[in-house]
Amino acid sequence: MTTIGTPLSPRATKVMLLGSGELGREVLIALQRLGVETIAVDRYDNAPGQQVAHHARTIAMTDPEQLRALIEAERPDLVVPEIEAIATPALEALEAEGVVTVIPTARAARLTMDREGIRRLAAETLGLPTSPYRFCDSLEELRAAIDGTVGYPCVVKPVMSSSGKGQSKIDGPEDVAPAWEYAMSGSRVSNTRIIVEGFVDFDYEITLLTVRARGASGEVQTQFCEPIGHRQVSGDYVESWQPHPMPSTALDRSRQIAKAVTENLGGQGIFGVELFVKGDDVWFSEVSPRPHDTGMVTMVTQWQNEFELHARAILGLPVDTTLKSPGASAVIYGGVDAEGVVFDGVDRALAVPHTDIRLFGKPESFVNRRMGVALAFADDVDTARRNAAEAASRVTPRAV
């Protein structure tokens, strides 16, 4: 039986989010609707999640001493990592000492904090199909890996990066050195390690939101949302839609792969499992033990969106992954480099049928920074995609 206290009281149920961007913001709102006291942590002040939480804290989350000191001072019931750039050894130590419960587990946070841990788990421990890959620590190793194993074309990514940063495609030998330099510039930490992956000849890629939550029996069960299709540019998502049609054999295989990975990681919560699909063949790509950016579409497609599913699951509550309507999301970009922008055209965007928008409240805009998202539902995915894209195009951030 789950008991939830009253916020700001001695018996409050307290949840700390490490990382308070747009996804964390929605998780915090979902938790507050369930009566949870929330603590939003980020590396900079006035992050989107900090604007809605009961408490806001700003620290260097990659500093183990700062992270430990904050957790020991706040004593939350749960610590929920919402980004990868965290001092995970400190989380593992605190969990082992019984100081706090990490969602889904401290081990999962460590394994998924970079591409090496999770790729080795999927391919080498679990034997799941993946693209050919090698890890490299120098330009010379990268050249050797491409010539000896991976071949052309291939993709280079820092082992620690997000939202496509530092990711590039290599078509021939002349691209190798620029790709290495770009990967070094896109890493989240001072780390010269990269992964180089051979190209998979896939028809499409999906995100399969996978939820580990307690059912009526009290046992942890695995449930799946309908597959989410998405389009990326330079490794960063620009639109997503749900459901994405796929053969039953491929869907079954996708669920088998997602279940194998998430069961091994353990704990409770939502996982964004990314997969490549060609016909009935499926390859594992990545997994995040938290809501996924492509999953923002669920705010208009599901009875419980990915943030509500995550909040319920980590609190030990039942979940419902039922789809209620086809829908789509489209990114609203900053368009300008400025602080404290204003948004023109919101009224015109919301005049598009069956649409909604989310403006994230990021204090600083960049040309290619994701500042919001347009959402649309319709009788079919194609109509929803057109409407979401149209609504997004009508919102214009402006420097003042």
Swiss-Prot record:
Segments forming domain ATP-grasp: 120-315
Function comment: Involved in the de novo purine biosynthesis. Catalyzes the transfer of formate to 5-phospho-ribosyl-glycinamide (GAR), producing 5-phospho-ribosyl-N-formylglycinamide (FGAR). Formate is provided by PurU via hydrolysis of 10-formyl-tetrahydrofolate.
Pathway in which the depicted protein is active: Purine metabolism; IMP biosynthesis via de novo pathway; N(2)-formyl-N(1)-(5-phospho-D-ribosyl)glycinamide from N(1)-(5-phospho-D-ribosyl)glycinamide (formate route): step 1/1
Enzyme class of the recorded protein, top EC level: ligase
Keywords on record: ATP-binding, Ligase, Magnesium, Metal-binding, Nucleotide-binding, Purine biosynthesis
PROSITE patterns, per database record: ATP_GRASP
Residues that, per the record, bind N(1)-(5-phospho-beta-D-ribosyl)glycinamide: E22, L23, E82, D293, K362, R369, R370
Lineage of producing organism: Bacteria, Bacillati, Actinomycetota, Actinomycetes, Mycobacteriales
Name of this protein: Formate-dependent phosphoribosylglycinamide formyltransferase
Residues involved in Mg(2+) binding: E274, E286
Substrates-to-products reaction catalysed: N(1)-(5-phospho-beta-D-ribosyl)glycinamide + formate + ATP = N(2)-formyl-N(1)-(5-phospho-beta-D-ribosyl)glycinamide + ADP + phosphate + H(+)
Pfam families: ATP-grasp, PurT_C, RS_preATP-grasp-like
Gene name linked to the record: purT
MF (Gene Ontology): ATP binding; magnesium ion binding; phosphoribosylglycinamide formyltransferase 2 activity; phosphoribosylglycinamide formyltransferase activity
GO cellular component entries: cytosol
Binding partners and assembly: Homodimer.
Binding locations of ATP: R115, K157, S162, S163, G164, K165, G166, Q167, E197, G198, F199, V200, E205
